[in-house]
């Protein structure tokens, strides 16, 4: 058994000793950012992926002072601070090494097919030099070499521009770093640059400040922090000096670098700076995690290897053949150039890029902003989605979900746009409860929002108070008016010790001048303060039966993963508390017991209304959705069930144990079809156990997980050969976003670091947008197959003329430059047009493609394109070629082995089949005519090829011949380019085109019709005999 995966077992500053700072070995810390501290990068990455192992949260203040050689009152001396700054370096994050832009550009110049074209260009210039030396130089090879270089440079620039994406992850982390810090040094308070902070410094923070380093709190007063970017917790977290948890990420006496203090004040000792802070470690981890190659990049690389392999193989075979047939080496080199150009689809990679760009634009309109174009298809290949809960699956706002009063549970409306609540509001108990909810609340709407819908108004207050305020406003209206009429005279804010909030109000009833005390807080604490309970508007003694009803409701609501609050009130006797009475909240000169319990209210961050349907679509599409959250397991499970990540009929081990009333250990784990796994459980798992979990359970929720555990979950999924999509919004998500096959950041709630690490940004933070992206991704894969099949088909029609030219010695049927006009002229727009083709069937009802089995270019596609349709096109081209020559007097048989005489400049009396003599110029003109006719023949047949590529299985009549209008724009572009080349540029000798007789345009039409009929028969038999030999070998 391998050792257990320690998730983030990090040594503080590289050492686990707790010596005073003065006694530690400074050599270990000098130049902490130098390479000599990174002898093994893979080892360092593994260290980064381990759980934080600190003990500072366990130490007393005295031990802390001793460990760091500091004093809570006086702080460090300036001299010592200078020494530590020189030793540890500034409190900043080290930027990663960047690949120079010129290197990125040069990679585009030699990637893909470019290297073959460079070879072709080099051979052109070599041929020219040889000809020049032999005094027979022709500028044709110079022109061709220049054109090939131009093609490489232009496609390289295009690819560089289109594929450039943000890799500056560290820069976004740096934006989060606080600029100034209030520090105590030499017994004086000083404002210094945060970069100058050192371990042992004593710093003070207040509401609104960013914490300038990892600190251990030694004083706190009402301090709350926002840790959401690090831990995923959406609720403000209280901070105190108490050691409350073994895990340093969850204890209350540690504050983390770059998190925000929301309210209160605190003083702390700096325990980590710069790269050694939690955010520093995450930044290093994100930068150190290598971006995985996207599936489409792997497919294109695979395709390039196939085409390059075919080109090189044919080159070698025919070079040897040419030499064996006594051709000059120079001629053999020229053959090589032609075969390279004929084999390489020069415009294809640019076409793929444009196709991906068009899809990316479509997705942007559907709120998916694609940063990395290849991610467009990756999303369609996704087989596992690891999704955050807060903000992605949920609405990212606390909302009132249930109420309990009069011994009944009422369901509240949790939809995004609440306009009213449907539960019974006629009871007197509800009147009292609604008053407490309204008055015992410090949240307020920002002014000037009267015309804004209530649920979209901006509120000053925390998440829970905001939910209660909006709930009250929807039902009662004019909450601020109610508060004015019930003036607040005293208040005890909520704190973690009391666990309640209390306020005292004058009442608006002119006949009742008693003060009203309202209280809300933890239900069990509120119940302790009550002696009566309100039922149907009447106070009754709080007996055992009522208490039991309370506990039943409390457990039921808590079991739904909702945050439950209790509410009670007390009218103060007018004779003891007259209108002139001065309330003192410090001495508490008023009653805090014998209240009347009114009811319970529970809140939750509810699911988005579109998510359940989106999850259902994922399941139909064979995609496993895994929830990974930092939230509580009960809450996570409740949301997972409500959105369908855990199906209604599927049980976890805990559910089975509860149903059978037995211990969890007694349940056979294989009986459960769903699993809820906590971060602590994951920490104790070996990689093999994680693999087993991911394999055996289709429905999984990971709760209370750390960011590093999220990365390990992603790696576990990838070990299953899954293509993994990960959503995230916080700094903590950056490593997992970068490691995933496709990282998806939140556009609204997402941090800069998350957006930079991701490949895609959801502009509306909505999980349903991912499913839309999956559909687009699957469609683009299908359409790319069609595009490649279309592009490859003509390669055989371009290659065969050179092979016949070499073997049979015919006059050259088509020139190299003419081929480039096909690849980069007539075929570009039609290739792109296929990106607009609609799906043939419901692509969301099939399983994700297997990244090793379902290839973009498979054997069936290559055989059908090359050997079926490709050979038909070649035959059609030769039919036109021989027709042109026959009409001019050269029968096909007379052309065999005529090449040498045909190309000899000194022969000006070459006889045709009728005895007519041809000069060298006349023969050259006829050669250009034959080449132009061959070009037109390929173009005509490519029109048929374009139409049949609209579908792979359905008849084009089922798909709709005119459904994709862009196809017809592509066809029109082919004809227009051919007309311009033939009739517009036909007089330019270097281009080898001539003005073609009208009848030659129609010679290849029967072949085009044959191609269409043949393909319709192929599709018919595939539909008639699914699963047959024909289906397996003829469907690509």
Curated annotation (Swiss-Prot):
Example GO BP: potassium ion import across plasma membrane
Any one GO cellular component localisation term in the record: apical plasma membrane
EC numbers: 7.2.2.19, 7.2.2.13
Record keywords, A-Z: ATP-binding, Cell membrane, Hydrogen ion transport, Ion transport, Magnesium, Membrane, Metal-binding, Nucleotide-binding, Phosphoprotein, Potassium, Potassium transport, Sodium, Sodium transport, Translocase, Transmembrane, Transmembrane helix, Transport
Activity regulation info: Up-regulated by K(+) ions in a dose-dependent way.
Main location class: membrane
Protein name: Potassium-transporting ATPase alpha chain 2
Taxonomic source organism: Rattus norvegicus (Rat)
């Amino acid at each position: 058994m391998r050792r257990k995966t320690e998730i983030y077992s990090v040594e503080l500053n590289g050492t686990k000793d707790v010596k005073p700072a003065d006694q530690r070995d400074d050599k270990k810390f000098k130049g902490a950012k130098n390479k000599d501290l990174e002898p093994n990068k893979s080892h360092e990455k593994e260290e980064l992926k381990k759980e934080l192992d600190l003990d500072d949260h366990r130490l007393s203040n005295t031990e802390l002072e001793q460990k760091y050689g500091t004093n809570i009152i006086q702080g460090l001396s300036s001299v010592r601070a200078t020494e530590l700054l020189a030793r540890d370096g500034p409190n900043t994050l080290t930027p990663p090494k960047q690949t120079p832009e010129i290197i990125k550009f040069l990679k585009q110049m030699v990637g893909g097919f470019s290297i073959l074209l460079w070879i072709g260009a080099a051979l052109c210039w070599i041929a020219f030099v040889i000809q020049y030396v032999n005094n027979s130089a022709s500028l044709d090879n110079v022109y061709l070499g220049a054109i090939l270089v131009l093609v490489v440079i232009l496609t390289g620039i295009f690819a560089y521009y289109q594929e450039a994406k943000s890799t500056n992850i560290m820069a976004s982390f740096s934006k989060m770093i606080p600029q100034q810090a209030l520090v105590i040094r030499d017994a004086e308070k000083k404002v210094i640059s945060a970069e100058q902070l050192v371990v042992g410094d004593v710093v003070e923070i207040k509401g609104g400040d960013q914490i300038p380093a990892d600190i251990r709190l030694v004083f706190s007063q009402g301090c709350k922090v926002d840790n959401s970017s690090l831990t995923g917790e959406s609720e403000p977290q209280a901070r105190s000096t108490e050691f409350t948890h073994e895990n340093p990420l969850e204890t209350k006496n540690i504050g983390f670098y770059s998190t925000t203090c929301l309210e209160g004040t605190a003083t702390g000792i700096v325990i980590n700076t710069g790269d050694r802070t939690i955010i520093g470690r995450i930044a290093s981890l994100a930068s150190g995690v290598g971006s995985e190659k996207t599936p489409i990049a792997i497919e294109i690389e695979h395709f390039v290897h196939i085409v390059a392999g075919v080109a090189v193989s044919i080159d070698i075979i025919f070079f040897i053949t040419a030499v064996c047939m006594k051709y000059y080496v120079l001629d053999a080199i020229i053959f090589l150039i032609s075969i390279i150009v004929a084999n390489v689809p020069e415009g294809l990679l640019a076409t793929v890029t444009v196709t991906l760009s068009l899809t990316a634009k479509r997705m942007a309109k559907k709120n998916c902003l694609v940063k990395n174009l290849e991610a467009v298809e990756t999303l369609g290949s996704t087989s596992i989605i690891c999704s955050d809960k807060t903000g992605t699956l949920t609405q990212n706002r606390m909302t009132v979900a249930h109420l309990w009063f009069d011994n009944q549970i009422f369901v509240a409306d949790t939809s995004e746009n609440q306009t009213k609540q449907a539960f019974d509001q006629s009871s007197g108990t509800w009147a009292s409860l609604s008053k407490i909810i309204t008055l015992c609340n410090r949240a307020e709407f920002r002014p000037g929002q009267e015309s804004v819908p209530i649920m979209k108004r901006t509120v000053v207050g925390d998440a829970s108070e905001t939910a209660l305020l909006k709930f009250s406003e929807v039902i009662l209206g004019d909450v601020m008016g109610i508060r004015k009429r019930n003036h607040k005279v005293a208040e005890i804010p909520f704190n973690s010790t009391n666990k309640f909030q209390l306020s005292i109000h004058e009442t608006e009833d002119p006949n009742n001048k008693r003060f009203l005390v309202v209280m809300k807080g933890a239900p069990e604490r509120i119940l302790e303060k009550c002696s009566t309970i309100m039922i149907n508007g009447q106070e009754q003694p709080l007996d055992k039966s009522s208490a039991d009803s309370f506990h039943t409701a409390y457990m039921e609501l808590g079991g739904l993963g909702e945050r439950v609050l209790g509410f009670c009130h007390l009218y103060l006797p007018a004779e003891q508390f007259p209108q002139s009475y001065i309330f003192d909240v410090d001495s508490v000169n008023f009653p805090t017991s014998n209240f009347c319990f009114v009811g319970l209210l529970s809140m939750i961050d509810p699911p988005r209304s579109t998510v359940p349907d989106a999850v259902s679509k994922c399941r139909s599409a064979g995609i496993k959705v895994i929830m990974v959250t930092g939230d509580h397991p009960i809450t996570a499970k409740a949301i997972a069930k409500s959105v369908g990540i855990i199906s209604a009929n599927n049980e976890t081990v805990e559910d089975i144990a509860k149903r059978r009333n037995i211990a969890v250990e007694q349940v056979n784990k294989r009986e459960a079809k769903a699993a809820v796994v906590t971060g602590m459980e994951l920490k104790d798992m070996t990689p093999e156990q994680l693999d087993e979990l991911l394999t055996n359970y289709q429905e999984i929720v990971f709760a209370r997980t750390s960011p590093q555990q999220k990365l390990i979950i992603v790696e576990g999924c990838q070990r299953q050969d899954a293509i993994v999509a990960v959503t995230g919004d916080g700094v903590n998500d950056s490593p997992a976003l970068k490691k995933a096959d496709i990282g998806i950041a939140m556009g609204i709630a997402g941090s800069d670091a998350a957006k930079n690490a991701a490949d895609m940004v959801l502009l509306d933070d909505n999980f349903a947008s991912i499913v839309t992206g999956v559909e687009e991704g699957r469609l683009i894969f299908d359409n790319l197959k069609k595009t490649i099949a279309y592009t490859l088909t003509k390669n055989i029609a371009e290659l065969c003329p050179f092979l016949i030219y070499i073997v049979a010695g015919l006059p050259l049927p088509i020139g190299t430059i003419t081929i480039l006009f096909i690849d980069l002229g007539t075929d570009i727009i039609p290739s792109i047009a296929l990106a607009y083709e609609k799906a043939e069937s419901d692509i969301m009802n099939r399983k994700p493609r297997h990244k090793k089995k379902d290839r973009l270019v498979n054997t069936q596609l290559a055989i059908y394109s090359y050997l079926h349709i490709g050979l038909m096109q070649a035959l059609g081209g030769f039919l036109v070629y021989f027709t042109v020559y026959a009409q001019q007097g050269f029968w096909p048989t007379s052309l065999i082995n005529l090449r040498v005489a045909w190309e000899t400049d000194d022969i000006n009396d070459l006889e045709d089949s009728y005895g007519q003599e041809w000069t060298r110029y006349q023969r050259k003109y006829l050669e250009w005519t034959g080449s132009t006719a061959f070009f037109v023949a390929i173009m005509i047949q490519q029109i048929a090829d374009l139409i049949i590529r609209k579908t792979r299985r359905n008849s084009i009549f089922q798909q709709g011949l005119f459904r994709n209008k862009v196809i017809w724009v592509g066809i029109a572009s082919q004809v227009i380019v051919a007309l311009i080349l033939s009739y517009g540029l036909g007089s330019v000798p270097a281009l080898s085109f001539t003005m073609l007789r009208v009848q030659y345009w129609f010679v290849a039409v029967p072949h085009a019709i044959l191609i269409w009929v043949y393909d319709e028969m192929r599709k018919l038999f595939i539909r008639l005999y699914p699963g047959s030999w024909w289906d397996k070998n003829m469907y690509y």
